[in-house]
Amino acid sequence: MPVASSEYQNEHYASFATTSRLVTCLVSETLVPVFFVPVKSVDRNNQFIGLCLLLRPTTVKQESELPTNITASDILTVVPLRGLPILNNERVALFNGIRCPQIDLVDFLDMLPHIYSVESSGSLKSGDSLKQKTFDTLSAILDGNKTFDLVDGYSAVQLWNHFAQDLEINSKLREQIGQELGSSILFQKYTYDNPKPLPTLNSSTIKWEQSVVEGHATHPMHKARKSFPPMPPLNPGSYDLDHPAVRLVGIPRENAILRGEYEELSAPLVNALMDAGGNHKDIRAQYQNYVFIAIHELQLPNIQEKFKDAVIFSKEHQLNVEALASLRSVARPDILPGLSVKLCLGIKISSALRTVTPFTTYFGPGFSFNVVPKLTYDHEVLAIERELGTITYRHEDSDVAKHCSSVIREALEYDPKYQDDLFIPCGALVEKIQRPDTDETLVAHVWNLDTKEKRVEFLDRYVDFALRSFLPPCLINGVAFEAHGQNTLARFDRKTGLLKGFVIRDFGGVKAHNETLKKSAGVELDILPDSCVEAHSLEEVFKLLYHTLFHCQLQRLIRVLDLHYSGEGWEIVRKYLTQYVPKDHVMWPMFMESSKVPGKCLVRMKIDELYRDYIYRPVPNMIKYEPQSVPEAI
């Protein structure tokens, strides 16, 4: 069992975890001018190589403009770096004769765990050597009064408020986003304060699902759990989100939209809920004109307020279930072997309320039964978990209906016939070992990847199998799965730890090009009007695959295996892309020739209050990454 680090440490690291992700987004989404400030002499002992300098958005009038001189009051924040971010050597600012290239992309792993605000009215107070080096490096490029102080621990909420004020974002949205960032920090600290036993090759999939420490590597709301009325406020420790209760609710049959085999597949869980407080035969006889649904306990106030004809059974009719990494999907393998259940949860987790829209409940079963069997993919390395049955409340407003719906999904990981295999959410592999003050991750710890040779061997097989899994449906059928670390499970042999393949789940974020699908597989998408599943071009499909598989999944593994800065990890990616993508395919130039690719803008989407519609901006194509050298100061 890991020992919890100190409360002060946890508070500092929790703030850093969230704020560093906000910095990452401000940089990659070009929301502010950002430059790399080289240190005069690199000191490898404290890993300090330079600064990530974020200027206020008011510093330049146009995005294309390069500032020529800056003062302390122009600075939004400054972050000392231990690893080189992705530099744009074609856009270099000259500050006091020091060449400062623009930063196009920075990762939280590039940063030392200190984020400073600049107090231009003060003077430097005593601090550690890193603070002094940061001060000296910064002073060298500033014009005007160089009397200022650096204050460590600049929080995401403070940074956001400063940025939003400069950008004149309306006060209501500013406050809302600030609250979500604050929630992220609070829940991150709670996770650090309460470390769990480290999972092993013998652990259950559920233990791995619940081993997530920091979550999404680039989303500032990576740990946010924010409820809204009529739900009570959700605070760290106020509810056990890993082991929630589900309650029995009945919906008049005429108000239930059913797809697939929902009633048959949900029957064991529904009967168990009925039997927990009575007899399922008697209850079914009494409520013959009702369909039944398991509802997350925290969601009950929304059911009560929005669905007046729903029957909420007494608290006796409840069962505890195991939450998966998403928190709203749950499992009870003893009651529903080989299945999992996606529930509605009216809580904002990262980007949106974790409800289940009618678009999702309609699309899943049709895609599962009609399209999945026709897709081109290697069944030896990829298993696709179909969505076999869904239920949604019949309501003309989809924003209301999404609060009372559910999906029954295949789950190989909970099927007894696969007990010799270990299924792990890929995002869990790259998580820290339940401590904030370490670089050691579960993949290196559990697989004992203590040499470079072992790390290269592990990554090589992983990339090979991942591309064999997710490229063919995209290349041939025009279908991209949302293959990020939460939706993708890696399948290992429990005895040897050898990777056997992957599993993909959750069709809510699939993108498909109907014309290509029809031409290659002879089937078409069956979707509701305004569904965001249908892509109007193949580029849309490739964008989703790049963001989820390459940016969110493979990049994380390459970085934690320490194969990023050397470029070796990306060489492996290019090796297999060259093997599996024909040079005359339209995917080739986007992935293998373009220096920039469309990057998903998480903060711009929050500012524009978007969830189902994405905003993209050009970001460096990491597939093309080559090693960089630290620029000289002059």
Curated annotation (Swiss-Prot):
Annotated phenotype, changing R354A: Does not affect the catalytic activity
Effect of L544R: Enables to accommodate serine in place of diaminobutane in the active site and significantly increases the catalytic activity
Organism superkingdom: Eukaryota
Cystines in this chain: none
Induction: Expression is repressed in iron-replete media.
Gene Ontology MF terms in the entry: acid-amino acid ligase activity
One biological process term in Gene Ontology: siderophore biosynthetic process
EC number, as in UniProt: 6.-.-.-
Top enzyme class: ligase
InterPro entries for the chain: Aerobactin_biosyn_IucA/IucC_N (IPR007310), IucA/IucC-like_C (IPR022770), LucA/IucC-like (IPR037455)
Sorted UniProt keywords: Ligase
Physiological role: NRPS-independent siderophore synthetase that catalyzes the rhizoferrin biosynthesis from citrate and diaminobutane via an ATP-dependent condensation of citrate with diaminobutane followed by the addition of a second citrate to the monocitryl-diaminobutane intermediate. Can also use as substrates the citrate and diaminobutane homologs oxaloacetic acid, diaminopropane, diaminobutane, diaminopentane, tricarballylic acid, hydroxylamine and ornithine.
Protein name: NRPS-independent siderophore synthetase rfs
Natural source organism: Rhizopus delemar (strain RA 99-880 / ATCC MYA-4621 / FGSC 9543 / NRRL 43880) (Mucormycosis agent)
Origin organism lineage: Eukaryota, Fungi, Fungi incertae sedis, Mucoromycota, Mucoromycotina
